[in-house]
């Protein structure tokens, strides 16, 4: 069943998954958490809040219990998740001290307005 989030009673949801952009999380996730729903947020909105754990279950499951501070769990960026899952066993064996990473993200990830500007950066004399 699909329901309008504006009318949704989060007290009826054990877990609420947010992945509709930071503005939606900003507006509705705190309400869901206050109503007793455990919020798992896949946007960037809560990633840097000290009281909200940033969780990759395969990497730091011991941090999950800290969601009780705000009833919210944040996820890292998708590139970060894949990387840390792969690096965790190496780190456990060899204690990685530093890593430099470059990622290349899709323009569409920043929204439809950014996509309209791709013609400014793409080569015009060859196929893409």
Q: Over which residues does each language-model region extend?
A:
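Single conserved hydrophobic/aromatic residue that forms the stacking wall/gate
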Residues: 119-128
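N-terminal Rossmann-like NAD(P) cofactor-binding subdomain of oxidoreductases
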Residues: 1-120
């Amino acid at each position: 069943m699909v329901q309008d989030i504006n009318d949704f009673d989060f007290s009826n949801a054990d877990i609420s998954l947010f992945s509709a952009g930071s503005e939606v999380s900003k507006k509705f996730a705190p309400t869901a958490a206050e109503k007793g729903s455990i919020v798992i947020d896949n946007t960037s909105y809560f990633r840097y809040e000290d009281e909200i754990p940033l969780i990759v279950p395969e990497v730091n499951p011991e941090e999950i219990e800290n969601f009780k501070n705000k009833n919210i769990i944040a996820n890292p960026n998708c590139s970060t998740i894949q990387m840390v899952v792969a690096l965790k066993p190496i780190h456990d064996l060899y204690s990685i001290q530093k890593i430099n990473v470059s990622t290349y993200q899709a323009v569409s990830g920043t929204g439809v307005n950014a996509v309209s500007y791709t013609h400014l950066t793409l080569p015009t004399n060859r196929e893409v």
